Amino acid sequence: MSDKNLKEIISELLRLGYEGTYWDFKEDYTDCREDKLIDIICMANNIDGHQAYLIYGADDNGNVKGIEKTKYSRYTTKSVTEFLRSKPFAGDYIPKATVQTLEIENHELDIVIIKNTNNTPYYLTEAYSPSHDVKKKLYAGAIYT
């Protein structure tokens, strides 16, 4: 997909002003690894069977805020891939994701693109809870959407 096509797709999703089954707006990154993982799994398992987008730098209504001043480490394709590969996914099938940065409304947005594959649903074979917060724990065998 060319940057222009991606920019058109993301601009249209932002204009809608709401989140959907295959796109989610994130105003900023988080350091909570459970939140990072569940966001990617949910998008990878979207019920539309569509390529999915985590759009960092926009609020829940699609208003562009920018991600350039985040205090957190920004995602790269390498960092997302390494993060996912280190998790206990069933069948060793991991979501396929890439990261691209776009400039929209004079701000940078980081877009995590989660590819649509035939390997869904993605789920873990072991519980995942590095923060030890029971409210954030991802459970083995659970299908998150």
PLM regions with names:
Residues M1-T145:
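Conserved N-terminal catalytic/coupling substructures associated with nucleotide/phosphate chemistry
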